[in-house]
């Protein structure tokens, strides 16, 4: 399968690579429809292709990059990828923050982080709420902030339903958009 070019250090299987391609494709379509300038469109594309670059990495590989002994294993991949990208010379704060916080959210995100958060949830390969998610994905170019709020709500409701921990950043993100 071909798709977005990943860093040589990426640890992803074929399913994850397909997800990354769908997320990046959705971000690219939104950027074109919204007529973003070239720099912002590239930031969205890069955030999409890098957000899960370490998703299939083990905690033993990722935790030393992150340096947080208490971070849940499933959350390590975003911060680890951001650290690695920064070491490799990436300087765009909006891209680094988008990648770093894409699993839990971040209240001080610029549009790049918000777009990635939505694309990660709304990409068409996910199997839950297909009709609702497709509708929301189509609305992003005309109601970016409204759809973002709804996606944050969806993620928060899912977190509560599953009995998962609500992270400080997630609560702060909700409070910033409600």
Kindly label every feature range from the protein language model.
Residues 22:
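Charged catalytic carboxylate motif
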Residues 149, 153-159:
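Internal alpha/beta core interface subdomains
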Residues 1-8, 174-178:
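Short, low-complexity, intrinsically disordered N-terminal peptides in bacterial proteins
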Residues 6-14, 18, 28, 34-149:
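Divalent metal-dependent catalytic cores for phosphoryl transfer on phosphate-bearing substrates
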Residues 157-178:
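Charged phosphate-binding loop/patch that engages nucleotide di/tri-phosphates or the phosphate backbone
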């Amino acid at each position: 399968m071909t798709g977005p070019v990943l860093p040589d250090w990426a640890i992803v299987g074929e399913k994850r690579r397909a997800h990354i391609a769908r997320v990046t494709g959705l971000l690219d379509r939104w950027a074109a429809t919204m007529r973003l300038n070239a720099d912002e469109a590239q930031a969205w594309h890069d955030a999409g292709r890098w957000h899960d670059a370490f998703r299939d990495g083990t905690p033993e590989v990722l935790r030393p990059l992150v340096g947080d002994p208490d971070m849940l294993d499933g959350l390590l991949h975003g911060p680890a990828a951001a650290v690695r990208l920064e070491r490799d010379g990436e300087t765009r704060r909006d891209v680094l923050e988008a990648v770093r916080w894409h699993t839990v959210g971040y209240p001080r995100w610029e549009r790049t982080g918000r777009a990635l958060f939505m694309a990660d949830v709304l990409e068409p390969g996910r199997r839950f709420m297909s009709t609702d998610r497709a509708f929301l994905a189509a609305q992003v170019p005309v109601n970016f902030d409204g759809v973002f709020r709804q996606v944050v709500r969806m993620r928060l409701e899912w977190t509560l339903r599953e009995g998962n921990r609500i992270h400080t950043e997630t609560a702060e993100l909700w409070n910033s958009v409600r």
